[in-house]
C-alpha cells in the first residue's frame, strides 16, 4: 500500500508517565522484565484496533473519531494508510497480508487492497444491515470472525446513527470460501474477541451499557462448526474489558480502565501493565516481543522478554 500522508517523522519513542508493571506471578514478572511503557504516538483522537502487519513490519491501528487508519513503522515514522474512513474500528491481517477492517459507518467488514481503498466484504445478515462491526480476527482457516454491537448506531462521533435492523448483537463468522455469513452466538454488546493458540476456545468481551448484564470476558469451546460450553472466563478489576489478545502460552492480555490486565488459561488474574489513560485494545508483533496498546489519543509500546 502506498503511503498516503506522513504525520510523524522517524524518531525515538519517549517514556510514558505511569507506574511500572505490577505482578506477583513469577512467570509474568520474567516476561515483563524491567520494561517500561513507551509512547509511540499521541496525536490521534481515539485510538483502537491495533494489528501487526508483518509484510510491512508496521503496526496498524485506527483513529476512529479522526476517521483514519494509521501505521507506525519501526523507524518511528507514522503514516496515514487510509483517510476519510467510515469510522473504522477493528483491524486484522489475513493470510495474504491484506488488511481487513470493521467499519462503523458502513456497518460492514471491508478489505484494503493495493489501491488503498477499503472494499466491501459483507454488510448484511439475512438481508438486514449489520449493526456496527467493532472488532475482528482472521482464523487459521481464513474465516473472519467479528463482533457486531450497536455502538456506531448510538454515538454520532463513532459512526452513522440509524435504526437497528437486526434484533440481536451477534458474533459472526464469514467463511473463507465466500459462503453465507454465519451468526455463531448473540451476546450483550459483544466487543473484543480472540482465539486460544489452538483455536479450540473463543474469547469474547461483553461491555453492556446499563442493564442487568455485567461486563466480562466470556469463553466458548469451538468444535464441530459451533460454539459450546459458554462460561464466564474473567472480569477486569477496573473498568471494562474492551479489546484483547492471547499469547502463545494462552495467557489473555485485556484492556481495562487501569491498563492491560493479564490472565492465565484458567482466568486467574496475574498482573497489570498500567497505562496513563484507559486502554482500549492491544496486540503483539509476530515474535511476541512487543506489546502494542491503544487508548485515548495514544499508541504505546511495551518491549517484552521471551
For each feature predicted by the language model, list its residue ranges.
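Sequence-structural signature of mature extracellular/luminal beta-sheet repeat domains
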Residues: 3-306
Amino acid at each position: 500500500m502506498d503511503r498516503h500522508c506522513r504525520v510523524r517523522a522517524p524518531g525515538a519513542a519517549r517514556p510514558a508517565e505511569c507506574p511500572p508493571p505490577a505482578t506477583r506471578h513469577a512467570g509474568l514478572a520474567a516476561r515483563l522484565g524491567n520494561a517500561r511503557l513507551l509512547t509511540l504516538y499521541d496525536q490521534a483522537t481515539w485510538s483502537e484496533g491495533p494489528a501487526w502487519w508483518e509484510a510491512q513490519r508496521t503496526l496498524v491501528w485506527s483513529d476512529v473519531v479522526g476517521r483514519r487508519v494509521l501505521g507506525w513503522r519501526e523507524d518511528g515514522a507514522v503514516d496515514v494508510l487510509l483517510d476519510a474512513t467510515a469510522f473504522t474500528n477493528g483491524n486484522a491481517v489475513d493470510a495474504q497480508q491484506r488488511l481487513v477492517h470493521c467499519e462503523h459507518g458502513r456497518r460492514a467488514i471491508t478489505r484494503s487492497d493495493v489501491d488503498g481503498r477499503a472494499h466491501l466484504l459483507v454488510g448484511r445478515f439475512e438481508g438486514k444491515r449489520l449493526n456496527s462491526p467493532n472488532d475482528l480476527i482472521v482464523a487459521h482457516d481464513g474465516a473472519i470472525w467479528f463482533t457486531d454491537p450497536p455502538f456506531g448506531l448510538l454515538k454520532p462521533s463513532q459512526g452513522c446513527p440509524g435504526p437497528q435492523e437486526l434484533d440481536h448483537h451477534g458474533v459472526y463468522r464469514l467463511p473463507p470460501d465466500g459462503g453465507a455469513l454465519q451468526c455463531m452466538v448473540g451476546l450483550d454488546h459483544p466487543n473484543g474477541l480472540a482465539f486460544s493458540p489452538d483455536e479450540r476456545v473463543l474469547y469474547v468481551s461483553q461491555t453492556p451499557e446499563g442493564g442487568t448484564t455485567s461486563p466480562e470476558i466470556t469463553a466458548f469451546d469451538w468444535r464441530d462448526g459451533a460454539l459450546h460450553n459458554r462460561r464466564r472466563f474473567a472480569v477486569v478489576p477496573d473498568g471494562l474489558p474492551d479489546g484483547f489478545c492471547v499469547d502463545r502460552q494462552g495467557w489473555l492480555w485485556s484492556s481495562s480502565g487501569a491498563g492491560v490486565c493479564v490472565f492465565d488459561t484458567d482466568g486467574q488474574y496475574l498482573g497489570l501493565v498500567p497505562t496513563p489513560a484507559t486502554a482500549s485494545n492491544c496486540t503483539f508483533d509476530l515474535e511476541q516481543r512487543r506489546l502494542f496498546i491503544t487508548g485515548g489519543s495514544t499508541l504505546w509500546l511495551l518491549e517484552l522478554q521471551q
